[in-house]
Amino acid sequence: FVCHLPSRRGGALVSARYRSYCCTRLREQVDSLMAQGGEGTHCLLLGDFNGDPEEAPTIEALRSRPYTADMAVQDLPPESLLALLHRETRQEPPGSYCYQGVWSQLDQAHLTASLLQQQGHLHYVVGSAETVCRPFFTTQLIGGGAPVPWRTYGGNFYRGGYSDHFPIRLLLEYE
């Protein structure tokens, strides 16, 4: 699933219910596909969730939990959703989006536990999920600090940048 959930415009708390609704529908689709597909079925959700992985729409409505390397994934139901980019995994940059100097991981990657349990030929390469920050994606804010995404637009002005979000990526292997 490639996702772009509703914006935080108007306030994160006010708009959270719209993101929760979308996450509930996504969870229903994941459950349906996993129930129909049997062993070797996997789901991957990527995109702009317009919230951090630790926020209510992700934790409660999507029922995704942070994946850590010490997690006993073999004991999880295959349809369990796991967030790959969260507070415990963040390095540099500290998120995929920076607004008024505050970083957030709005761009997220979630996968079913089946992709970690080596069911079938396809699996996630553990530790490969990352927020991609290359020099040509960035600009320096006045006053210094860490480089931030080089926006395409600033208000109504075209700036010519790549995006206001850094991209994310992960590796899957097929054996």
Regions found by a protein language model. Give the residues of each.
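A long, amphipathic alpha-helix that forms part
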Residues: 13-39
